Amino acid sequence: MRNVILHLCYLGTAYHGWQVQKTEVTVARTLELAAEQVVGHPVHMSGCGRTDAGVHARHYIANFRTDARVPAERLPYALNTHLPEDIVVMEAWDTHEGFNAIGSCVRKEYTYQIYNSKIRDPFYVNRAWFYPRQLDETVLARAAEQFVGTHDFAAVRSV
């Protein structure tokens, strides 16, 4: 059985996070349903981590196993025809049997955006925190210094 890696990006506004839930629409389940239509059998998607409800992912890695003969380079096109516009498979490739998106993840990067203006911009809705008051850049710079360097976030990670 092949082990296939998918490089995804998605807008999480309409989803209750990555992880499959019994009664909620999730990114993983939406992707599984699309993959099942393409490969012709049930699949289980493993993701590189959980995202919360409403969270977006610009570069997200998932993997699944299949014995379908669809070439990996054709999978993005095939999957994207069965996915909503807010989930896109950017690329796919075959990998070794031992790869698992969550267990093989070596790095995560989070971006938090502040839209600082007196007037809201609809293009930033669900993509940035709207803050209409004056920002104290000195305080922000001082806070940002705490993140410079290498840190052990083991106490707050989920993997």
Language model features with spans:
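Structured-RNA-binding interfaces characteristic of tRNA pseudouridine synthases
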Residues: 1-159
